[in-house]
Amino acid sequence: EAAATAGVGPMAAVAGAIAEYIGRRLKTEYDCREVIVENGGDIYADIVEGMDIPVFAGQSPLSEKVGIFIPEGGRISICTSSGTVGPSLSFGMADAVMIVCSDAALADSYATAFANKIHTKQDINNVIAEIRKIPAISGAICIKDDMFGICGEYGLKIWKQPLIR
């Protein structure tokens, strides 16, 4: 259903759906206060406080230097797709498209759909405009080479040095 909504094949929703399923089971079966499950760039989180989310974008000079701040706790899904990083099939060349939704399968599907639409950095503005029209998406970052676009309800975070390495 999520993949059909985003206009992609059903496999585009699998990693996000699995992350959310595992996260919800951990939370209920083990009475965890907080849960964060990461599955190949797709995150399901049920958190008490806010958190920073940097974006890994491969060889882009913006990789791990831009991201968002989730200001408060709750259930959230953050999924990323790329045409230049990792083994997954992509019809685009985005270094990273990160989508934030309440539903992980939907976030995963939309990340794939919008990553497929970015071939050059000139595509970013049109993709961001398209993302803004979708009420289910609460935030997004698109990265290609040295350019990025952001939209949604979360604040932009910038780091001088990559956080991960």
State where each predicted segment sits.
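Flexible, glycine/charged-enriched surface loops at secondary-structure junctions
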Residues: R33-E34, K121-C151
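Conserved mixed alpha/beta catalytic, RNA-binding, or beta-rich assembly cores of soluble enzyme
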Residues: E1-A3, V8, A12-I22, C32-V127, ...
